[in-house]
């Protein structure tokens, strides 16, 4: 039986976060009434000329530096010629032979797949290029009684098209790459990453070949995948389709396909024979883009600390695991919140801070469907909760209750934890004599568990600990309860 290898390359369109379009001064704001943000340049009216947006170029430079790519000192804009109703000029301004960003790489973390028996691993994906181009308008097919409406608000919006080498070997790797790239462009501030609004969308080139064969199989390109789930589902379906087709004696046709999320399948859009011959040629209205070394150095000096460097620093500075560091640097906001907590609670509490962010804080954020930026518990408030655990004022169980209380009341005061502790009498019982008296009562009321423990049943001891904690309403130190119980049980 033939063993198959999957070959995947991704082309990703990241909408650059400029205020105006790439070749005009029209706004890029999402959600405006149709055709209210299209100026004469976007509409291709006679006598207008494009003027390159410096901000778009700077964002491309920033991306190139972040991935260790070559930023071309001289690149060319080209006309990509094709006809479509939402493309007013009859061509798209893009880059072809000489892109602004060349090469580079992104390291991805592929999660474990227990069902398939695969462990987590890291992999470096090489990039071919990233080039600047303008977006097309939008064709609207609904609510027009069999006709198509054209909205040109999006026409001319700046895009950075990022192209990988065909090095990914599974849908899991493709999704891991897409997530890493998404996180990076958002971290750099060059793209807002809003997939629902089309700010970040992928085209997947998928083929299969027998294991060991060097020659690539015939590929299909799946267009405009705007969610990580769609990307994974589309690739998995396409891989199954191609393998079944070949094993049934058929041949894969090079074509463009669309993903149908309702049916969870891909369907043919156009074959190679119908594919466009774009007839690229240099745009005579735009001078070559020349980027000097001083410009690159200035952008480099303004770059934020990159996620990989921050992960390494968190491991070395705070003693957290590599995995934890990866989670904590998943977004710039999460990393900033963590460091703000540690700055207040002290470096000695860094590990417990990491545990709280990945546990209770993330759980509450998911429950309420919000990001860390909107967390109602400030870093200073959480830091005080952690300090009260560390100094023995409260137990971990009580700390969780206090955290939820601060969250639910959206307390504004930095000392909210202390206020709630005092108001509800939540201080941990530290008086050994008082705790011993409670434990004596627990032992007297649970004679059966005492007998079972002395007969060698360890579970009985845990039951006694639980009863003691219940009797103290969770205000006892669990470690102290353990020690006193062991002492009294001999």
Curated annotation (Swiss-Prot):
**Signal peptide annotation:** none
Q: Which reaction does it catalyse?
A: L-glutamyl-tRNA(Gln) + L-glutamine + ATP + H2O = L-glutaminyl-tRNA(Gln) + L-glutamate + ADP + phosphate + H(+); L-aspartyl-tRNA(Asn) + L-glutamine + ATP + H2O = L-asparaginyl-tRNA(Asn) + L-glutamate + ADP + phosphate + 2 H(+)
Could you tell me the EC number(s) of this protein? Answer: 6.3.5.-
Which Gene Ontology terms describe the biological processes this protein takes part in? glutaminyl-tRNAGln biosynthesis via transamidation; translation
Q: Which GO-annotated molecular functions does the record name? A: asparaginyl-tRNA synthase (glutamine-hydrolyzing) activity; ATP binding; glutaminyl-tRNA synthase (glutamine-hydrolyzing) activity
**Cited InterPro entries:** Asn/Gln-tRNA_amidoTrfase_suB/E, Asn/Gln-tRNA_Trfase_suB/E_cat, Asn/Gln_amidotransferase, Asn/Gln_tRNA_amidoTrase-B-like, GatB, GatB_C_1, GatB_Yqey_C_2, Gln-tRNA_amidoTrfase_suB_CS
Q: How does it assemble?
A: Heterotrimer of A, B and C subunits.
The family this protein is said to belong to: Belongs to the GatB/GatE family. GatB subfamily.
Xref: NCBIfam families: gatB, PRK05477.1-2, PRK05477.1-4, PRK05477.1-5
Q: Which PANTHER family match?
A: GLUTAMYL-TRNA GLN AMIDOTRANSFERASE SUBUNIT B MITOCHONDRIAL AND PROKARYOTIC PET112-RELATED, GLUTAMYL-TRNA(GLN) AMIDOTRANSFERASE SUBUNIT B, MITOCHONDRIAL
Q: What HAMAP family does this protein's entry cite?
A: GatB (MF_00121)
Q: Summarize the protein's role.
A: Allows the formation of correctly charged Asn-tRNA(Asn) or Gln-tRNA(Gln) through the transamidation of misacylated Asp-tRNA(Asn) or Glu-tRNA(Gln) in organisms which lack either or both of asparaginyl-tRNA or glutaminyl-tRNA synthetases. The reaction takes place in the presence of glutamine and ATP through an activated phospho-Asp-tRNA(Asn) or phospho-Glu-tRNA(Gln).
Q: What is this protein called?
A: Aspartyl/glutamyl-tRNA(Asn/Gln) amidotransferase subunit B
| Source species of the chain | Burkholderia thailandensis (strain ATCC 700388 / DSM 13276 / CCUG 48851 / CIP 106301 / E264)
